[in-house]
Amino acid sequence: FRRVLFRSQAFLAEKIFEPLNMLETSFSVEPEFHDRVAEPFARDPDGGMQMKVIDVCSAATLASGGGGLVSTASDYARFLQCMLGRGQLDDVRLLGPRTVDFMTTDHLGEIPIAPTGSRNMLPPGHGFGLGFAVRRTAGANAEPGSAGSYFWGGLAGTAFFVDPALDMFGCLMIQAPNQRDYYRALFRHLVYAALTD
């Protein structure tokens, strides 16, 4: 198991993090950088419930490309710049442009996202690509954004969006209990409200 964990970490470092100069992204934080970790609340301030999150200061036991990475705002911004560049950042081509287009295209179509009466993970007017919620049309939703924009969130309230039509992205790095949907929506509204062009 440790061999698989190491290979996953090494693969991501070699193929993604190092080429994009994301040198502060990993599955755990080295001891000399523990003082830089933004610790989430120990208790949910809304209900007082004890919160349990991943201990990023200990060695990772699972290398999941879909969850568990630790990063900085500047490293995450480099990844989002690469996505906005359709797979290229500076002189580094990480993905082909058509691959990024395919990843950020709705693949659900009319497939129901959630059973009737249950909480839907996607807002109205959105579908899902390969790892991203994708906006199908403008309107149909209170969230601002262009058709073709895509987003997702991480543990403890982190969130990002990429809006290719407006040539921009946003990244919200917070550490709080639960998903903090209100703050994610507020962040996006404030970013779009600040646009002057």
Model-found features: residue ranges?
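Short, surface-exposed loop or secondary-structure junction motifs
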Residues: 2-144
